[in-house]
Amino acid sequence: MIESISKIIKYNFKNPQLLNEALTHPSLVSKDTLKFNYERLEFLGDAVLNIVISEMLFNIFPKDTEGNLAKKKTALVCGNKLVEVAQSINLGQFIMMSDGERACGGINNFRNLENALEALIGAIYLDGGFTAAQDFIYLFWEHSATHMNVPPQDAKTILQELVQGKRLPAPAYHTIDKSGPDHNPTFTVEVRIPSYQAIQATGHNKKLAEQKAASLMLNQIHNKTK
């Protein structure tokens, strides 16, 4: 497995245990088995991805305003883009998970793909340093970033316009939980739209959680209309 994914991502781990941790779904972890899963690495990878994408856009678009750069960054780190990259490297087939999670379609679950990809970035960062993580991100994001001629809309805006076109009420966002320490909280937000299943998502701030929830709701709407 390690050799196969290393060829795809064009990076060889010096410490294979980091890769194993990045690909271990929480469902596989118990007191009697593995100690770690990908959640800690996911937290780290999210931060690394954001700084690399920010620097990438800063260099590619020297004349862009802060607002335009922020919109572009949102599009490049949103759930849809993470899933796109994860699917391009067949990441789902490498995620180790419980039989129950796998039976429920875990290898194709968008949230699992997003989390594992961010964990993979975190693992590369710890194993090879910032430059190694930067090279990986540039490999899979630079083309998309370079061709962003028009600042994209964020997921909440796209969802708002979509439901308006369907003559549905505006999406309703509710914060249903806040956990973790004050210096590093995790917010759980739920978005509701009539005729669709409510969607929950988490983030390190309410804005990020709402964007993730909107992105997941967009996926649900698109899948339902196929």
Curated annotation (Swiss-Prot):
Annotated Mg(2+) binding sites: E42, N115, E118
Family annotation (Gene3D superfamilies): 3.30.160.20, Ribonuclease III domain (1.10.1520.10)
Residues covered by the RNase III domain: 2-129
Pfam families: dsrm (PF00035), Ribonucleas_3_3 (PF14622)
Substrates-to-products reaction catalysed: Endonucleolytic cleavage to 5'-phosphomonoester
SMART domains in the record: DSRM, RIBOc
GO biological process: mRNA processing; regulation of gene expression; rRNA processing; tRNA processing
Entry cofactors: Mg(2+)
Location of the active site: D46, E118
Keywords from the UniProt entry: Cytoplasm, Endonuclease, Hydrolase, Magnesium, Metal-binding, mRNA processing, Nuclease, RNA-binding, rRNA processing, rRNA-binding, tRNA processing
Role according to the record: Digests double-stranded RNA. Involved in the processing of primary rRNA transcript to yield the immediate precursors to the large and small rRNAs (23S and 16S). Processes some mRNAs, and tRNAs when they are encoded in the rRNA operon. Processes pre-crRNA and tracrRNA of type II CRISPR loci if present in the organism.
Family: Belongs to the ribonuclease III family.
Quaternary data: Homodimer.
NCBIfam families per UniProt: RNaseIII (TIGR02191)
Protein's recorded name: Ribonuclease 3
Organism: Ehrlichia chaffeensis (strain ATCC CRL-10679 / Arkansas)
